[in-house]
Amino acid sequence: MIDEKLKGYIDKRLNEIKDKIPDKLHEDLRAAIMDINGVELTEEDIDRIIDLTIREYQQSLIEPGEAIGVVTAQSVGEPGTQMTLRTFHFAGIRELNVTLGLPRLIEIVDARKVPSTPMMTIYLTDEYKTDKDKALDIARRIEYTRVENVVSSVSVDISNMSITLQFDQEMLKDKGVSIEEIKKIITKLKLGEIRIEDNDEYSFTIYFEKIDSIMALFKMREKILNTKIKGVKGIKRAIVQKKGDEYVIITDGSNLEGIMNVTGVDINKIQTNNIHEVEEVLGIEAARELISREIKKVLEEQGLDVDMRHIVLVSDIMTRTGDIRQIGRHGVTGEKSSVLARAAFEVTVKHLLDAAARGEREEFKGVIENIIIGQPIRLGTGIVELTMKPNMR
């Protein structure tokens, strides 16, 4: 237990070092010291803890002139060679696939508009998260369901100009849809003059009074089958899973804006792997954070440990202009100010011709262009400029 006298000493020492460490580390250090229980601390112990923290923090900083770009490229690229090239099933869910390993890492740094396996993890509000039935109800509401998802067979009668729909009883129950609900939706469609007659409990026939061509009848068939019954566009499948003490919904497909409007969803905890969607809905800072998390997640799933600072550098470079740009000739590399650096990467002749036509000037400020012409690069000891005063005697 820390007494009031020691608390005063802790605050005094922490105020003395406020300029030596970041604010967040300062807050965390104070909280960590105050949380120490079961040990009687002295002022000397407090001094040792604070001095050790400052020393460790200062040792974690890079040296001036460090080639952080090359170190990051090696630190992320080398583990990338150890990655698998497969798509895995999502843990415990047979129906959902998730791209992992090198293919997912390539997707992220290429800034692909849509991931190959878009997914969301949806957390629920307190009222819904502990009740499985309520969670299932939300899952049914967000899963995008069309008429074709619940029919077992469709038959077209060209003599009577009618379409008969036979519905799958199990699918209706699974999706939480009723026949009456489907009838109401079909009658609201612009199908012209129609008449609906029941055949049995799970089947009805739609008669078209004013259609006289087979092509028009088949167009109506497609229109009916593609009609939305309910759900959020882009969500192909929604599955409820137990996670600790609460139920969460895992989806195949992603629609962040649509899901945020669903009652019962905790909008502060929604997760998606679609980076461009996050940028459109929440902004570039949120997208930057997601890039870092997704890269870290991919590496950790493969059992690879990479310093977070390397990963953050990649996400910073990809988002520094306010838009998400890929690491490649159509993004970061292709937009370098140096003509020689652009030419050294890809399509050399095109870059040189374009630069000559525009009258661009090479400043030789970067690494690649200086290596090309054989002069020292401005990194490490090369960043230091010294002038020696000769002995005039």
Curated annotation (Swiss-Prot):
Gene3D superfamilies linked to this entry: 1.10.150.390
A GO CC term assigned to this protein in UniProt: cytoplasm
Highest rank taxon of the organism: Archaea
InterPro entries associated with the record: DNA-dir_RpoC_beta_prime (IPR045867), RNA_pol_Rpb1_5 (IPR007081), RPO1C (IPR012757)
Subcellular location, record wording: Cytoplasm
Keyword Transcription set for record: yes
Record carries keyword Cytoplasm: yes
Record keywords, A-Z: Cytoplasm, DNA-binding, DNA-directed RNA polymerase, Nucleotidyltransferase, Transcription, Transferase
Pfam families: RNA_pol_Rpb1_5 (PF04998)
Enzyme Commission number: 2.7.7.6
Catalytic reaction annotation: RNA(n) + a ribonucleoside 5'-triphosphate = RNA(n+1) + diphosphate
GO BP annotation list: DNA-templated transcription
GO molecular function, one term: DNA-directed RNA polymerase activity
Subunit record text: Part of the 13-subunit RNA polymerase complex. Interacts with TFS4.
HAMAP family for this protein: RNApol_arch_Rpo1C
Function as written in the Swiss-Prot or TrEMBL entry: DNA-dependent RNA polymerase (RNAP) catalyzes the transcription of DNA into RNA using the four ribonucleoside triphosphates as substrates. Forms part of the jaw domain. Reconstitution experiments show this subunit is required for basic activity.
The protein's name: DNA-directed RNA polymerase subunit Rpo1C
Protein source organism: Sulfolobus acidocaldarius (strain ATCC 33909 / DSM 639 / JCM 8929 / NBRC 15157 / NCIMB 11770)
Taxonomic lineage of the native organism: Archaea, Thermoproteota, Thermoprotei, Sulfolobales, Sulfolobaceae
Chain's gene name: rpo1C
